[in-house]
């Protein structure tokens, strides 16, 4: 769904265009930005700039702070791991937000993800599944990150261990992720791409000027 903001002169501007201007700091646009944040959660889309703008407006206007929207922004940032979006969002939080129990839980989840303790992460999510249901594609996004970590860490992995890392998924979901990543099932193991294929040779080029080379050659005579 497209979102537009109305300027003081009556002109209508797309929200993405507004975010590139000084108008992003206008509190009159906050309701539109908040609606845009909620639509991101519903439509499985993501706009970090809009989410940061929303948190910045809360900083400037604490009386307008909305905790539900804050939860949505933080949970959406988790879905973009391993990028550092969550850190950027966390830096903009007010004390009132940081002291909220749900925010503390999301911060804890981010810490767990950063440590790649995926079994603990899923156990925390399963304690309050309703809290995450409003974020369409939340589990799939986290599983994408899990597969990213597995892909750069393992050459082969026990099938049941991978099942746990993905959140105790069934065979259908497991097979879908194995196929999506180009892995192969072999007995009780999943064969991950060879790590040698992920190693990139680094070429170092050193530039030596002729003026610097002259004295060196003279010393060799």
Swiss-Prot record:
SUPFAM superfamilies: ARM repeat, Winged helix' DNA-binding domain. GO terms for cellular component: eukaryotic 43S preinitiation complex; eukaryotic 48S preinitiation complex; eukaryotic translation initiation factor 3 complex. One of its GO terms (biological process) is regulation of translational initiation. Gene3D superfamilies: ARM repeat, domain 1, Winged helix-like DNA-binding domain superfamily/Winged helix DNA-binding domain. One of its GO terms (molecular function) is RNA binding. Residues 46-207 form the PCI domain. Keywords: Cytoplasm, Initiation factor, Protein biosynthesis. Its main location: cytoplasm. It comes from the Eukaryota. It holds the Pfam family CSN8_PSD8_EIF3K. InterPro entries: ARM-type_fold, CSN8_PSD8_EIF3K, eIF3k, PCI_dom, Transl_init_fac_sub12_N_euk, WH-like_DNA-bd_sf, WH_DNA-bd_sf. It is found in: Cytoplasm. Belongs to the eIF-3 subunit K family. Component of the eukaryotic translation initiation factor 3 (eIF-3) complex, which is involved in protein synthesis of a specialized repertoire of mRNAs and, together with other initiation factors, stimulates binding of mRNA and methionyl-tRNAi to the 40S ribosome. The eIF-3 complex specifically targets and initiates translation of a subset of mRNAs involved in cell proliferation. Component of the eukaryotic translation initiation factor 3 (eIF-3) complex. This is Eukaryotic translation initiation factor 3 subunit K. It comes from Culex quinquefasciatus (Southern house mosquito).
């Amino acid at each position: 769904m497209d979102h537009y903001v109305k300027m003081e002169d009556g002109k209508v501007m797309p929200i993405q265009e507004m975010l590139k201007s000084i108008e992003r700091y206008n509190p009159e646009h906050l309701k539109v930005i908040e609606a845009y944040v909620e639509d991101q959660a519903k439509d499985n889309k993501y706009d970090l700039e809009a989410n940061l703008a929303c948190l910045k407006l809360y900083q400037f206007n604490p009386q307008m702070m909305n905790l539900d929207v804050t939860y949505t922004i933080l949970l959406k940032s988790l879905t973009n791991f391993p990028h550092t979006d969550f850190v950027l969002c966390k830096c903009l939080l007010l004390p009132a937000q940081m002291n909220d129990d749900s925010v503390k839980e999301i911060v804890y989840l981010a810490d767990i993800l950063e440590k790649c303790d995926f079994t603990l992460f899923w156990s925390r999510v399963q304690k309050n599944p309703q809290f995450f249901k409003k974020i369409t594609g939340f589990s799939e996004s986290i599983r994408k990150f899990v597969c990213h970590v597995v892909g750069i860490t393992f050459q082969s992995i026990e099938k049941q261990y991978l099942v746990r890392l993905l959140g105790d998924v069934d065979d259908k979901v497991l097979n879908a992720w194995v196929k999506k990543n180009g892995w192969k099932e072999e007995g009780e193991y999943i064969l991950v791409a060879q790590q040698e294929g992920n190693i990139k040779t680094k070429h170092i080029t050193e530039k030596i000027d002729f003026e610097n080379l002259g004295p060196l050659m003279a010393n060799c005579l």
